[in-house]
Amino acid sequence: MSGILEQETVMGIVEAKNLTFEYIRRDEEGNVEGITTAVDNVNIDIKAGDFVAVLGHNGSGKSTFAKHLNALVMPTEGTVYVDGMDTKDSGNTLSIRQTAGMVFQNPDNQIVGTLVDEEVGFGPENIGVPTEEIWERVEKSLKAVGM
């Protein structure tokens, strides 16, 4: 060996290839009225341990990009991989959501239940935890904080 280490090619924990997402506006009959490109041909490869910030003005596509990371929306074009899983493959959705989480910047977008126990149970429900186990976790969690 000549002292030069060969770098192993490793897929990132998040990888977007030619990611494009378009919002399509339709009239009441379903005819296309307009298309807005929110994410335009983004390529990024984030490795374990990387720190990444996505910055931009309001309406620049940051949240739309983030929604691709846990398969809340699907690319119009291109591909997004999370821990090697293609977000377009519906068979991967649960595993992706167990791997990549999201916390919205506005609390009104995060609160989903009208009762505290529904809100506490929201996360486990979205990652496929069985209902009985969800309620056990909710009860234990609320008890731990005196509720």
What does each model-found stretch correspond to?
Residues 33-37, 94:
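Short coil-to-beta microelement around the adenine-binding A-loop and adjacent beta1/P-loop entry
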Residues 55-57:
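The feature captures the beta-strand-to-loop junction immediately N-terminal to the Walker
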Residues 70:
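Helix-to-loop junction immediately C-terminal to a conserved catalytic motif
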Residues 78-88, 96:
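Conserved ABC transporter NBD signature motif
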Residues 108, 114-125, 135, 139:
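Short helical segment in ABC ATPase nucleotide-binding domains corresponding to the A-loop/adjacent helical element
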Residues 130-147:
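Conserved ABC ATPase "signature" region
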